[in-house]
């Protein structure tokens, strides 16, 4: 019995040898491993709560000939890997499997499939891999089970020796809040109070932290702090100072508000300036609800205060100004006449 099994297996391997693509991609057994690699453009980027889904389906473009067949549909044609906000550091590579042991093959041969990444949940800031991989499932007669079974698998991309690996990149953005004080009465040394609220969503949960750098006047190194999503972050800025959220996730809603300084005779204007976008001006002390994009954002709060000259002082000074003008005019007339 064993001799017969070996002879059959050897014959099958010889028959299918012409269809083997690269030895580096061969997997023994009935399970195909798919690797997902999430590259962080910003090493401090928050990883979203999301799934990446892969689909395998019969390759209907195959011309069936001899031992070459279109694949047989799997009972479970979809598999996925899951990422959460807790995935940090070196945990950005994950794997999933397709199991061909559940498939009933009618006869030995090489069965062809295609594996792709599905864009079921398209996360803002994530670029998706559009590669389509070819999978060859080599089905041999199994003497013990008395039926054809998946014995080894070859997965590859045309012209490549690498195994099936889908690569995605995750980008983050920056949000800069600047302070400007103008006018003859504006206090350039005053600390103005602000609040920043980042709102949680399905991808980024409350209490997850982003990094903030505060730049002050004088050329000192930026001071680094953290802000939590869904918690009001308080900060102060003087004229010429700023804060920058350095790893703001794309697709997060936020609001920046300054305290109301009308009682101190300040008028406030907010300038919202997206990178490569249209500038928006808001009369008031708060932004509208903004949504972060893959373009960096700069928001400038300008507080203006001018001193008014008291009416009494103006009335008292006015006669002297008039007399001065008359005196200067008379002097000029005298000089001009003398020269004539």
UniProtKB/Swiss-Prot annotation:
The record marks 117 as: Autocatalyzes isopeptide 36-168 formation. It is found in: Secreted, Cell wall; Fimbrium. Residues 312-340 form a propeptide. A motif (EVPTG sorting signal) lies at residues 308-312. The modification Pentaglycyl murein peptidoglycan amidated threonine is found at residue 311. The record marks 258 as: Autocatalyzes isopeptide 179-303 formation. Its main location: secreted. There is a cross-link at residue 161 (Threonyl lysine isopeptide (Lys-Thr) (interchain with T-311)). There is a cross-link at residue 311 (Threonyl lysine isopeptide (Thr-Lys) (interchain with K-161)). There is a cross-link at residues 36-168, 179-303 (Isoaspartyl lysine isopeptide (Lys-Asn)). It is a peptidoglycan-anchor. Proteolytically processed and assembled in pili through a transpeptidation reaction catalyzed by the sortase C1. The last pilin subunit is cross-linked to the peptidoglycan. Residues 1-23 form the signal peptide. It comes from the Bacteria. Keywords: Cell wall, Fimbrium, Isopeptide bond, Peptidoglycan-anchor, Secreted, Signal. GO terms for cellular component: extracellular region; pilus. Major component of the pilus. A stack of the pilin subunits, joined by intermolecular isopeptide bonds, forms the pilus. The pilus is required for bacterial adhesion to host cells, for bacterial aggregation, and for biofilm formation. Forms columns of about 3-nanometers in diameter of head-to-tail-assembled molecules. Belongs to the Streptococcus pilin family. This is Pilin.
């Amino acid at each position: 019995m064993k001799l017969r099994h070996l002879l059959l297996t050897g014959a099958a391997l010889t028959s299918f040898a012409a269809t083997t693509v690269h030895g580096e991609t061969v997997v023994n057994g009935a399970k195909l491993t798919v690797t997902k690699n999430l590259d962080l453009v910003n090493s401090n980027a928050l990883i979203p709560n999301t799934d990446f889904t892969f689909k395998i389906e019969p390759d209907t473009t195959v011309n069936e000939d001899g031992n070459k067949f279109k694949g047989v549909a799997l009972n479970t044609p979809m598999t996925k890997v899951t990422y959460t906000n807790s995935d940090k550091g070196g945990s950005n590579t994950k794997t999933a499997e397709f199991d061909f042991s559940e498939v009933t093959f009618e006869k030995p041969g090489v069965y062809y499939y295609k594996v792709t990444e599905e864009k079921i949940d398209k996360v803002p800031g994530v670029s998706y891999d559009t590669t389509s991989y070819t999978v060859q499932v080599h089905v041999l007669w199994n003497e013990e089970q008395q039926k054809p079974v998946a014995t080894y698998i070859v997965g590859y991309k045309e012209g490549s020796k690498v195994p099936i690996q889908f690569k995605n990149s995750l980008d983050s953005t920056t949000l800069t809040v600047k302070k400007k004080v103008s006018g003859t009465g504006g206090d350039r040394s005053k600390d103005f109070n602000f609040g920043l609220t980042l709102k949680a969503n399905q991808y980024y949960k409350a209490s997850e932290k982003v990094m903030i750098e505060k730049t002050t006047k004088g050329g000192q190194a930026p001071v680094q702090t953290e802000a939590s999503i869904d918690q009001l972050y308080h900060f102060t800025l003087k004229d010429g100072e700023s804060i920058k959220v350095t790893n703001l996730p794309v697709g997060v809603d936020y609001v920046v508000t300054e305290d109301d300084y009308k009682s101190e005779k300040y008028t406030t204007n907010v300038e919202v300036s997206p990178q490569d976008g249209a500038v928006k001006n808001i009369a008031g002390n708060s932004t509208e609800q903004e949504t972060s994009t893959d373009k960096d954002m700069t928001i400038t709060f300008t507080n203006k205060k001018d001193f008014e000259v008291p009416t009494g002082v103006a009335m008292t000074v006015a006669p002297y100004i008039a007399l001065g003008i008359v005196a200067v005019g008379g002097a000029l007339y005298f000089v001009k006449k003398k020269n004539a």
